[in-house]
Amino acid sequence: MKTPNFIESYQTEQYDFCDRVIARLEEYISSQDDSNVAMHFMNGSVTNGGEQSRRDYSFNFQAMQDPLVVEMHEILRQYIPNYAEIYNGFGMQGCMSETMKVQKTPPKGGFHTWHAEHARNESASWRNLTWTLYLNDIPDGEGETEFIEYGMKVQPKKGLLCFFPAAWTHTHRGNPVYSCDKYIATGW
């Protein structure tokens, strides 16, 4: 369905995939000792010159040969054409990254600063389209992805795949969770 804000969500039935991604992240977290956590996770660290603090665990699955990354790309290939058809001319070429970032946000954790995914710095300047797959259900009123310009919130629901432009026009944040962990997979 075409919306005036270029934010589209599709309820997939990828529940088993969601469970496997969560299990893989939890396995990775439990295998790390304290000396390695800082290299792979943002657990109370501060980024962007001290302006943005966050408390969550994230891991970038970078290997294109990783079965979970390959499977995520297959899922994206099912839904990106729908988005491209609705918004023809958006320019979907090369919109899938090689990286799948998986995050676990504990209660009262997260990254709540307004931000956009496309930035001037070299590591984010190529981003055009953001996708987020919510890996678990979150109670209403918690953990939404909120878009400031549109007064819109996307409620996390297991298997929900959300697409939106990475530009400043889609400045957003993740709202806090209070009662459970929140898991997402995301990329650009």
Where do the language-model regions lie?
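Catalytic core of non-heme Fe(II) oxygenases with the double-stranded beta-helix
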Residues: V70-W188
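Non-heme Fe(II)/2-oxoglutarate
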Residues: M1-M92
